[in-house]
Amino acid sequence: VPDLRIVDFGRVSALRSQTLWHALAYGVSAGAPPTLSFMRPARPYVGLGYHRRLEEADLAACREAGLPVYRRMVGGGVVYLDEHQQFFQIVLPVAAVPRSREAALRRLLEPAVAAFRAAGVPAELDGDNEIVVGEAKICGHGAAQIEDAVVVVGNLIERFDHVAAARVLALPDEVRAEVVRLMERFVAPTPVDPAAFRAAAIAAYGEALGLEPVPGRLSPLERERLDELDGRFRSPEWLRGPQRPAPKCSQVKVRAGVYVVWIEQDGRRAVATVIGDQIDRVEVSDPELDGALTAALAEARLVG
């Protein structure tokens, strides 16, 4: 039976909680075995998805709170990460996963669901590929292809500071208040034993992928890539990312299917909350913005 390399890095710096698994992806791309890794950041910080505008993070609030900001190579928005989150990453050669992104994501998240369940959390993978208990997301995940490797990252959230998570987003106050309200409903921590979760994840991924879990470590090539990644992730150019035009309307995703969308014109603002494909609530400071908000929602494809 081929190996599933298991690497548990334990507690690491905020920077390394990102660069280590990127290094593993380059290693697997170059021929290292499929790898399941674990780590926990030693301090809070903010992660930014690969394709997102840096302006989506409130950099002044991050500086004031002493939170570093790192751009990662998987998608998603601005996320608050801290020492109360157990990170896990599964990395496979691209040839070993289904071609369809949807199918690949389900295949690589289902063992995580099994691990949550084994640790005592009644988790399910819903139709939006969110790991949930009821309507609440319990695991933030992201996915990417890095060279010839596919990586899916996720977290076991033992405690979650919804207010701190909303504070790092660049939002008008009324939008921030709505995001906190939605996070409290739709993002839930699962305070279970992280060691039990890790053991269950190792067993579940080994079984699902037909691989034999074997303790491992970084290869020389991965150590080399790690040094390079540490430098890249610290560079202002990498953090700034590609220049993208500001969107006509702004939106924050709380979980799949739950968004706050808003537009601003000449100091006036219209805000809508979307749950499923229904508009849950709307606040418009000027009736003239109604049409613009409706058009923005249609354009964002959040409401049919």
Language-model features: locations:
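Structural motif
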Residues: 133-134, 265
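N-terminal lobe of the biotin/lipoate ligase/transferase fold
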Residues: 1-103
